[in-house]
């Protein structure tokens, strides 16, 4: 099975088990890329079976620099979809760590391994200094990407889920279209 993977360019995908990632991974495959899903340990079961058999899965932690370094090694691009819409104090993960620190780790790893292409999915309304901690952290992470030396593309879609409870708000067609644009932009 893995010999078939040798002809593909591998793309690290964070957030591949989330609502958007479920559409991005198949789009990347259609465009001739091999997604390497960087997933939290224990969330591997959330990957759709048809996607799992056509990608690689690397468990890791975006907030741990060494983990991201290992996950990114050997990839040609990074699609950073991972996001947390609700702070998780019991697990000790504030927005700042989940978004800003994780994005800094992605940028560091890209630099370390010579990865030049980064696709970053932010959110409409994100800006550093926003009174809402979510939009503040997303804005700070986006500013890190924009200040990097990478060839980057930032997507700023409207939230496709309810920020209060995480329930999906967007139609599958919206997510499919966004996923297609993301996959197409990896080639640029």
Segments predicted by a language model, with ranges:
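N-terminal Rossmann NAD(P)H-binding glycine-rich loop of SDR-like oxidoreductase domains
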Residues: 8-33
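Structural motif
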Residues: 10, 76-77, 117
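Conserved glycine-rich Rossmann-like NAD(P)H-binding loop of the short-chain dehydrogenase/reductase
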Residues: 33-41
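Conserved Rossmann-fold NAD(P)-dependent oxidoreductase catalytic core, especially the SDR/UDP-sugar
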Residues: 34, 92-149, 153-156
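NAD(P)H-binding glycine-rich loop region in Rossmannoid oxidoreductase-like domains
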Residues: 43, 53-101, 105, 109, ...
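Flexible, glycine-rich beta-alpha linker
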Residues: 129-133, 153-175
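Substrate-positioning beta->alpha
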Residues: 169-187
